[in-house]
Structures are given as structure tokens and as C-alpha cells.
Amino acid sequence: MCIRDRYYAETVIKKSLDKLYNLAQGGTAVGSGVNSPRGFDKKFIQHLKKISKLPFKTASNKYEALASHDVFIEVMSGIEILTSSLFKMANDIRVLASGPRSGIAELILPANEPGSSIMPGKINPTQCEALSMVCAHVIGLKNSITFACTQGHFQLNVYNPLIIHNTLDSINLISDALISFDKNCLKGIRANKAKIKELLNNSLMLVTPLTKVIGYDLASKVALNAYNKDISLKQSCMELTNLSEADFEKYTNPKNMV
């Protein structure tokens, strides 16, 4: 469920952090440093590093640091990758937990609330829905940051408050949502082993590895025959091919496909 996307997002975010530490203090109005005491920028950075314990540094080009805040687009792009991955994960879990009898129902979600106000006993995927809404909101915040970063007219971009506010808001929202999702959903999820086994054994797609044994055309006939007659893939294979039961079990064993 997009685990590698999560690590990719983490890589993008970490790489962009180094650029965030470049500060324009000492550049005064447009980056020239006019009227700034000599050495102010370095002393400011030293003091900030001391109280924050973070590796801040003075920007090598203060003109660029004041006029452009593109680094925030880079940071938010990493966060947007994370939100996209989380949105997919939440949606996958929600669909896999659909049911309990008319859906996929491979997952059993923890009951965080009494249930539906309309349908008694119905367990709503509220944590999945909450996380997906947070992701949608953060993607919107990222778009507003992108627009704000276009407003660097000549030597100065005065949209800093919007950029900083939405960046921090995005980080806080995603952090809180992840903590809640982990606590109230992930840690309580259970696999519905009986349902998983039922769906796995009834899956017509297990015919796929048989193509290298009986050929694509015959494998297609086996799958369609099983579907049209509402019989198992194994029964259909026994009807239409010379494959033994042992060989069928051997080639269609899901463990060999993991």
C-alpha cells in the first residue's frame, strides 16, 4: 500500500530541508545588506543556531533568498507526495474493509464509534475518511503556497505569512492525522482470514500462472468456463485440460506468487 512512496516522500522532504536553513537576515530590504551592521548576518545565525539547535546558515545570495521562496514548493512537494500515498493507503483500507457481507471484507476495522446513526451495527471507516480529508486539505494548502511563491515581484516576495502559515499548518495537520490514524485504526486492524481464503480460492485470476503450462488461449477458456458455469477454477481446469490436480495445485499456489 504505497510503503515505498512513503520512503520516497521522506527522501524528498529531507533533501529539501537543507535549503530551508538558508536565511536572508542581514540582507535588509532587497538583499544588498545596506545599513546592516557588518557581521550582523553571521552573529544572528550563530545565536539562532544556539537557541534552536538547528543548522541554520546565512544565505549565500540574499537577493535570491528575499525575492524567491521556491524551496517551500520543494518541501511541500515532498509533503504532497506523502499525502497522495496516504490518501491511497486510506482508500485501499476503506475498500478492503467494505462489507461485512456485501463487500470485500478482507479487513476488519476497529469500531471507534457506536456505528451508523441510520443503520444499526454498521461500522464506519471514519479514520480512513478523516485521513483522506486531511490529505485533500493539505494538497489545497500546497497549491496556495505554490501561488504565493509566484508573487516575488522584482526583489521582494511579501507573501511570506501565507507561505509559512500554510506550510506549518500542513505539517501539523498531517502529523496529527497520522498519530490518530495509527492509534485509532492501524493498531486495531484485523485480517479476516476466512474471507481472504474464500476470495483467494474463488479467484479466477489464479489462472494466470497456467498460461506458461497450457497456453494463453486454453487458460482463457478455463477462466471463462469457470465463470459461466459458476464453478471453481480447478473444476474447470479438470474439465478442459489434461492437467492433474497435483499440477494444478502446484502452479496456482498463491504462495509462489508472493
Question: Where do the language-model regions lie?
Answer:
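Heptad-repeat coiled-coil alpha-helices
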Residues: 15, 19-22, 95, 102, ...
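Short, small-residue-biased leader/transition segments that mark boundaries at the very start
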Residues: 1-3
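Heptad-repeat coiled-coil/leucine-zipper interface motif in alpha-helices
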Residues: 9, 16, 82-85, 96, ...
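Glycine-rich phosphate/diphosphate-binding loop of Rossmann-like nucleotide-binding domains
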Residues: 10-24, 42, 46
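Acidic, glycine-rich loop-and-beta core segments that form the ion-binding/anion-interacting portion
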Residues: 30-116
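FAD-binding core of FAD-dependent oxidoreductases
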Residues: 17-37
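Catalytic-core signal marking the mid-to-C-terminal active-site face
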Residues: 64, 68, 91, 98-258
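Amphipathic alpha-helical coiled-coil segments
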Residues: 6, 13, 75, 79-82, ...
